[in-house]
């Protein structure tokens, strides 16, 4: 097995998650997705597409973490429990390599779509939020 510094893949323990300039602790997963609004272009006389065109970029990121007693995502100002969402500005969510400090992927201009929490007997309480973002990149 290679030492952490010589590993060729990212693992959950070689990256950290930042929202704004704050490291977000106890995160369990972050899943980003992009859709391109791909549409087939068809013509009379064939059921086969002649080409594909990209019509609309849509990106989402879902963050799941253990819910902290004093610093849940709403109290941190990242999301909200009600109409206070109207006071929230867009945010940037960045995954950083904790060895090189390079950006793995940055989600820019994030706005919350949903926020939920889960309370289950004999389990750690969790919270989840989904954002839509304007763009993603590997640069600052």
UniProtKB/Swiss-Prot annotation:
Subcellular location: Virion
The protein's name: Virion protein 5
Lineage: Viruses, Duplodnaviria, Heunggongvirae, Uroviricota, Caudoviricetes
Principal cellular location given in the protein's record: virion
A Gene Ontology cellular-component term: virion component
Keywords: Virion
């Amino acid at each position: 097995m290679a030492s952490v510094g010589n590993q060729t893949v990212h693992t959950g323990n070689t990256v950290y998650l930042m929202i704004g300039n704050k490291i977000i602790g106890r995160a369990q997963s972050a899943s980003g997705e992009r859709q391109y609004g791909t549409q087939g272009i068809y013509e009379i006389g064939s059921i086969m597409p002649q080409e594909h065109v990209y019509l609309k970029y849509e990106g989402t990121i879902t963050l799941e973490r253990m819910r902290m007693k004093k610093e849940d995502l709403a109290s941190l100002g990242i999301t909200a429990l009600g109409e206070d969402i109207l006071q929230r500005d867009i945010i940037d969510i960045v995954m950083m390599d904790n060895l090189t400090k390079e950006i793995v992927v940055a989600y820019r201009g994030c706005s919350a779509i949903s926020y939920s929490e889960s309370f289950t007997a004999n389990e750690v309480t969790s919270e989840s939020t989904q954002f839509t973002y304007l763009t993603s990149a590997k640069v600052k």
